[in-house]
């Protein structure tokens, strides 16, 4: 018997429909749905353990998003022909979903939760990452897992001033906005995206537009859950609590923490002072009490610490390090810090420091993207590294973390639209975070800008970035500029904004509270603009404009376009010509065929080597015109003529037959021309008999009068 299928539809308002269905697939999961639009099919499942994981005080949530190659009718690459570790784009989608879901579970729910979202069928007109949040939330809606409220996510674009929900990849190429928004019916929870220098007001309009569509998607989830039969929320073992212990900890610690926080101090000094207070609090309990309830003492101390620090800011407008809410930490920058790289810059803001390098190359170094939903390449990409010493820690290095992928992607999106479209280089920027106490990704944007300018990349405009925070108790609120790491953990919002003097280029926002008003978001954006323009002024004081040219030891790239039928001649049999040319000139030559033309990239540090390659290309592609005169030089003597080369393109040779030397009969070639002689010839085209090129010296000479025959 085929199980009953439950289906709900979402009208996107432009002729497209999303359907959510359940009842047939993955029924042993706590919740499962299939999301469809066009030919795209996404399976979303959620499972949670029945018991909390022992010894942890956080939510062990795992969000996994995978795109199956079969979905696009393709085979995975590699030796094993099997999907393996997730790609960067899959990791980014996992983060987008995780950041919206995580705050919505009960704070005392510590059972392991696994959300799995899989692309099972792909439609080239649909970008599946925009549907991942919908699939995850719909699966949770059908489960008995405790969950505060339903959410969904949507992508918004804008073409010619008109907003579009969930645009296709082709539409995004024309759009000046690419933002993902995650929200519940009442509140915005997450924003991330890139823009082409839009205003703060335009960004808010885009968020509001997406939110209205998200409300429709959430209503469809509610209808599906009602039709399917919403399960009763499971009971779970809640965290133990003790009001008496909390009161004792708060009474002993609150005032001391408040006084430490309002004075303002450096991170290490402040941490030591808080640790000392914690030890004083623990001393109020016996060893037996700590053995039984030590975890509660630590938990309540953290809760008291958070409350006291937040109240200092709301009461006094003072922050942990003594700054006012709008104040930015001291900044210093330096370019050309590393002597042998193509471009480098050091950016330090307070206790956060990033060292960025820029490396230039040919299209051969482009970052290749090969996933079921996207194929292509990136000629500009940025990598972000966050070593443990940057926070004074020692921990194992286990490869690139999801956080590093996410932060690097944000910085890349902030900068990429300021790279000129006609820039011939492939560019890799690497940010090494050397110190971190808040907004290291924004330090990466600033250091990345300076490293690109130092490398001689003619950026359209420099980009700066700032991380904003928020503290609110429901009645009062304080927007914080340039937040510390502690303010990120203790606050209600982490809002990163990057932009130029003309507008916003990228943003990332995570909101940890419900019901954040648009007025507060508007205030945060306005304060962020003041902050990033202040930082931008410091960047331009360090380096006002990009350096005129690349550095002497950095490669220069020259591009030439040749007819497609000459590509083979430039490469040569088995690559012989191009390999010998690269070896002889010390250059790198890359040839790409575009629209039946050959685009040749020549990369080298020696101008003479580049000129030699250009001369060779001119020689190979030189095509004389029939009837035109050209200057030639004799380079070889033969019994039946002379081999000459065009002086304009040395190496391009042609035979001048003895019969074309002069009008008079020529017995010996040397009677007319000799080695090294330079003269003009006329190009006659291909000889119909030999099919070889033919030139003539005599065709440019006056023809002697015919002798009359004697009777």
Curated annotation (Swiss-Prot):
Ranges for domain KH: 555-617
GO cellular component terms given for this protein: cytosol
GO biological process: mRNA catabolic process; RNA processing
PROSITE patterns in the record: KH_TYPE_1, S1
Keywords: Cytoplasm, Magnesium, Metal-binding, Nucleotidyltransferase, RNA-binding, Transferase
Pfam families: KH_1, PNPase, RNase_PH, RNase_PH_C, S1
Protein's name according to its UniProt entry: Polyribonucleotide nucleotidyltransferase
Disulfide-bonded cysteines: none
Compartments (UniProt record): Cytoplasm
Family: Belongs to the polyribonucleotide nucleotidyltransferase family.
GO molecular function list: 3'-5'-RNA exonuclease activity; magnesium ion binding; polyribonucleotide nucleotidyltransferase activity; RNA binding
Binding site for Mg(2+): 488, 494
Main location: cytoplasm
Role description: Involved in mRNA degradation. Catalyzes the phosphorolysis of single-stranded polyribonucleotides processively in the 3'- to 5'-direction.
Reactions that this protein is recorded to catalyse: RNA(n+1) + phosphate = RNA(n) + a ribonucleoside 5'-diphosphate
């Amino acid at each position: 018997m085929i199980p009953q299928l439950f289906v709900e539809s979402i009208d996107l308002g432009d002729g497209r429909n999303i359907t959510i269905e359940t009842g047939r697939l993955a029924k042993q999961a706590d919740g499962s749905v299939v999301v469809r639009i066009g030919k795209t099919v996404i399976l979303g499942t959620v499972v949670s353990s029945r018991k909390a994981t022992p010894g942890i005080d956080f939510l062990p949530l795992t969000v996994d998003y995978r795109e199956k190659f079969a979905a696009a009718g393709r085979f995975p690459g590699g030796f094993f022909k099997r999907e393996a570790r997730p790609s960067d784009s899959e990791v980014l989608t996992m983060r987008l979903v995780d950041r919206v879901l995580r705050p919505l579970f009960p704070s005392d729910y510590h059972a392991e939760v696994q959300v799995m979202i899989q692309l099972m069928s792909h439609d080239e007109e649909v970008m599946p990452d925009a549907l991942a949040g919908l699939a995850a939330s719909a699966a949770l809606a059908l489960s008995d897992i405790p969950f505060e409220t339903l959410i969904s996510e949507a992508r918004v674009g804008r073409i010619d001033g008109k907003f579009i929900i969930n645009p296709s990849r082709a539409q995004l190429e024309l759009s000046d906005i690419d933002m993902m928004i995650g929200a519940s019916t009442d509140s915005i929870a997450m924003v991330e995206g890139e823009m082409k220098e839009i205003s703060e007001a335009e960004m808010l309009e885009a968020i509001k537009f997406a939110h209205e569509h998200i409300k429709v998607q959430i209503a469809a989830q509610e209808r599906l859950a009602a039709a399917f039969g919403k399960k009763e929320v499971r009971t779970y073992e809640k965290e133990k609590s003790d009001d008496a212990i909390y009161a004792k900890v708060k009474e002993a610690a609150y005032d001391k923490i408040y006084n430490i926080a309002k004075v303002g101090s450096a991170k290490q000094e402040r941490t030591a002072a808080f640790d000392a207070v914690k030890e004083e609090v623990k001393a109020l309990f016996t060893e037996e009490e700590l053995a039984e309830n030590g975890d509660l003492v630590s938990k309540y101390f953290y809760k008291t610490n958070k409350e006291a620090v937040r109240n200092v800011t709301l009461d006094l407008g003072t922050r942990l390090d003594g700054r006012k809410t709008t104040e930015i930490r001291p900044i210093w920058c330096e370019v050309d810090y590393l002597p042998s790289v193509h471009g480098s810059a050091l950016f330090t803001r307070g206790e956060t420091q990033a060292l960025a390098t820029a490396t230039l190359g040919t299209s051969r170094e482009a970052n290749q993207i090969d996933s079921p939903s996207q194929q292509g390449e990136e000629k500009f990409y940025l990598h972000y590294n966050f070593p443990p010493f940057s926070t004074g820690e020692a921990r194992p290095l286990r490869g690139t973390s999801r956080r590093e992928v996410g932060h690097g992607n944000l910085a890349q999106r902030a900068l990429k639209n300021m790279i000129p479209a006609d820039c011939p280089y492939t560019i890799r920027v690497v940010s090494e975070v050397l110190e971190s106490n808040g907004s290291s990704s924004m330090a990466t944007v600033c250091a990345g800008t300076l490293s690109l300018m130092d490398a001689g990349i003619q950026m359209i405009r420099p980009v700066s970035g700032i991380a904003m925070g928020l503290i609110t108790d429901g009645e009062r609120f304080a927007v914080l500029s340039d937040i510390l790491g502690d303010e990120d953990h203790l606050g209600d919002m982490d809002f990163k904004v990057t932009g130029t003097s003309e507008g916003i280029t990228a943003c990332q926002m995570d909101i940890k509270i419900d019901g954040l008003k648009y007025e507060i978001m508007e205030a945060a954006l306005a304060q962020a603009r003041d902050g990033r323009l202040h930082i931008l002024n410091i960047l331009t004081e360090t380096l006002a404009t990009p350096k005129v040219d690349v550095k002497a030891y950095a490669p220069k790239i020259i591009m030439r376009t040749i007819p497609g039928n000459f590509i083979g001649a430039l490469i040569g049999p088995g690559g012989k010509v191009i390999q010998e040319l690269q070896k002889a000139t010390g250059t790198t030559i890359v040839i790409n065929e575009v629209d039946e033309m050959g685009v040749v990239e020549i990369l080298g540090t020696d101008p003479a080597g580049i000129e030699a390659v250009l001369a060779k290309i001119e020689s190979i592609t030189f095509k004389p015109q029939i009837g035109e005169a050209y200057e030639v030089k004799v380079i070889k003597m033969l019994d039946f003529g002379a081999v000459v080369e065009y002086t304009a393109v040395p190496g391009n040779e042609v035979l001048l037959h003895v019969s074309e030397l002069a009008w008079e009969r020529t017995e010996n070639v040397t009677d007319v021309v000799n080695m090294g002689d330079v003269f003009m010839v006329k190009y006659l085209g291909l000889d119909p008999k030999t099919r070889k090129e033919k030139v003539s010296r005599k065709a440019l000479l006056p023809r002697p009068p015919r002798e009359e025959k004697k009777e």
